[in-house]
C-alpha cells in the first residue's frame, strides 16, 4: 500500500469517528408508564415508578382511550400538582405526556375519566 493511500484512509477514519463522538443521543424518559394495559384493563403499567430528583416520567396512551394524568394535591402543593398534570385527553395510541420531577416525595396521580375504575398511580422521587 502506498503512503498516500494510508494517509487518506487514516484521514477518513478520523473524520468518520468524529461524527460518533459529537452526536449525542436524544434524552429518553427515565421511566415510562403505559396508560391502559396490553389486555385493555384501565390501569397504569407499572402503577408505581421510582426515579431520582431531576428525572422524568413519560406516560404513553396504550389502549382504551381517552386518558390523562392529574396529580392529586395531597402530599404536594397545589401549584406543583397543577404543573405536573396533563389534563388534556390522549385519544390516539402512542400519544404521550412527560413530566419532570425536581423535588423528592411521593406523587399520586390518576386518570380523570377512569379514576372511579381504579386507574391510579404513584411516582416516588428519591
Curated annotation (Swiss-Prot):
GO terms for cellular component: plasma membrane-derived thylakoid membrane. Induction: By copper. It is a peripheral membrane protein. Residues 29-126 form the Plastocyanin-like domain. Keywords: Copper, Electron transport, Membrane, Metal-binding, Signal, Thylakoid, Transport. The keyword Flavoprotein does not apply. Participates in electron transfer between P700 and the cytochrome b6-f complex in photosystem I. GO terms for molecular function: copper ion binding; electron transfer activity. The gene is petE. The keyword Membrane applies. It comes from Synechocystis sp. (strain ATCC 27184 / PCC 6803 / Kazusa). Belongs to the plastocyanin family. It holds the Pfam family Copper-bind. Cu cation binds at residues 67, 111, 114, 119. It is found in: Cellular thylakoid membrane. Coiled coil: none annotated. CDD domains: Plastocyanin. Its main location: membrane. Its cofactor is Cu(2+). Gene3D superfamilies: Cupredoxins - blue copper proteins. This is Plastocyanin. PROSITE patterns: COPPER_BLUE (PS00196). Residues 1-28 form the signal peptide.
